[in-house]
Amino acid sequence: MSALFAGVVLSFTSCNQSYTVGYLYVTGTVTAQSSGEGIITGIEIDHNTGKMSAVRGTPVSSGGANPVRAVLLETSRFLYVLNRGATASGSADCTTADPCKNSNITLFTVGGNGVLTAQQTFFTQGINPFRMIADNSGSHLYVLDHDAPDSAAYSGVTPTAANPNSCMLALGNSATSCGDITAFSVNQNTGRLQLIVNAPVTAANGSALLYFPVPANPVDFAQAAGSVLTLSGTPAASYPYTGGTSVFPYTYSAANGQLTINQNSSQPLGIAQGTALVYASGVVYVLDNEPITVNFNDVVTTSSSQILPFVVGSNGALAAEPGGVIPDDPTLSNPIYLIVESKGKFVYVANQGNNTQGANAQSGIAGYFITTSPAYQLSFIPDEPFGSGAGPQCLVEDPSSQFIYSADFNDSSVTGRVVDPNSGVLNNLRVTNTYALQGPATWCLVDGRTN
């Protein structure tokens, strides 16, 4: 990507030019407010130093309460924020028994200098939406709802073979409860979302089903090549939803965004506390927050959590990488997100730790070398783990491939690091490492279009 030199500032102490290489957007809430009203903070990234400074006019309202995900389309013109809403008591702890209300997807246009302008609001078909992705072309948007509207666990109505609900119709007679995926097509001129109906499945009343059921208790999902994979598991008593045990595949159509079931059963992973599913550089990574002792590169390693890498086969089937499971850094826990840096040499894993308040010694960033010959394998980068703010929720690499940023929940900050391109070590920025937010961060993304 070529950077456009808008607003170049010349330094008289250096031959370097300083300019904005991209914009970092962080969703979250405001600590001073009890309503959970969401905000989006825009941050300019300096090309030379990685310094963070405010985008004019931000933070702006996210369009609802408790934003949890944001997606920027490939064109960088449209940004979508998923607001989870709040329970009847005003809590952000959305559960099947106490669901959140007034959830929505708010569309923003991205203007000059990274300015965000709210446009329209859209809604999912299910209950408790909490994850959102776009396909690679930016033509389709998908939202994962924790509960389908007629799921027995949510509705309290037990379906029968004579009177099935959507879960049974799509997933088989034993599936009386389920989550769902709401799918949209994206108008490339306006960003407006249009609902995609479930063509293969007809509702019990004969009408088209307006969503795509997935197994009960979903945790996370991702598009992986020609499939959309959903990690599901055991019921979670509170948000965030964890306990992932298996992965269910839908076949994805790039032409129309349609999702089609190719097998009715999930693939068990042999884990009990899956926290996230990430597709990066051709590999599916499942993050699992339970202890493991393993011989890792000829060293017996005991960790509080682990990473399971897979290759996606036909019909979305997962095949474990030959190198087997990967231990998390022994000093960290509760992995929540993973990125592969742009050159494909290093993997970084954000661990939010198992503490939920204040400073968190178990949170930070684990780092790995990637080896692909003779087989895929990871090995720890020397001097890892790397510091972050407390409770990182996400990781992004800046458009110039120099810096890695985390957005942090517990201490309401963004933390930046410089990537050593040879060793993969994440060093401190030459300027201030952190950027203070108005409240806890929940997600982050980066935009490389600066004109």
Task: Indicate residue ranges for each PLM-predicted region.
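Sec-dependent bacterial lipoprotein signal peptides
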Residues: M1-T13
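Predominantly soluble domains enriched in secretory-pathway, periplasmic, or organellar proteins
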Residues: C15-N451
